[in-house]
Amino acid sequence: MALSGLQRQVIHFYRRCLHAAKAKEQPYNERWMAFVHQEFRKNQTISKRDFFYIEHLLRVGQRQYEAYSRPEVKDIHFS
């Protein structure tokens, strides 16, 4: 089954986030990986046809990615 352009964008963004999480220092990278997984799982139930909301989440996620991927950001705490 062929993926839509938006699905490809989400998958590409997910992989970029995982790569950035793995690049964080030990032992923090495990928490970063858990954070990435949690954020994407949290939105897993969104309808594939809700394009505007998915695009909104990609924009918000991109801003978070830029903030969190800065070298001075070492650790993350979430619940």
UniProtKB/Swiss-Prot annotation:
Protein localization: Mitochondrion matrix
Any Pfam family matching the protein: Complex1_LYR
Transmembrane intervals: none
One Gene Ontology term, aspect cellular component: mitochondrial matrix
A GO biological process held by the record: mitochondrial respiratory chain complex II assembly
Top-level division of the source organism's lineage: Eukaryota
Keywords assigned by UniProt, alphabetized: Chaperone, Mitochondrion
Function: Plays an essential role in the assembly of succinate dehydrogenase (SDH), an enzyme complex (also referred to as respiratory complex II) that is a component of both the tricarboxylic acid (TCA) cycle and the mitochondrial electron transport chain, and which couples the oxidation of succinate to fumarate with the reduction of ubiquinone (coenzyme Q) to ubiquinol. Promotes maturation of the iron-sulfur protein subunit sdh2 of the SDH catalytic dimer, protecting it from the deleterious effects of oxidants. May act together with SDHAF3.
Family recorded in the similarity comment: Belongs to the complex I LYR family. SDHAF1 subfamily.
Quaternary structure note: Interacts with sdh2 within an sdh1-sdh2 subcomplex.
Protein name: Succinate dehydrogenase assembly factor 1, mitochondrial
Species whose genome carries this gene: Schizosaccharomyces pombe (strain 972 / ATCC 24843) (Fission yeast)
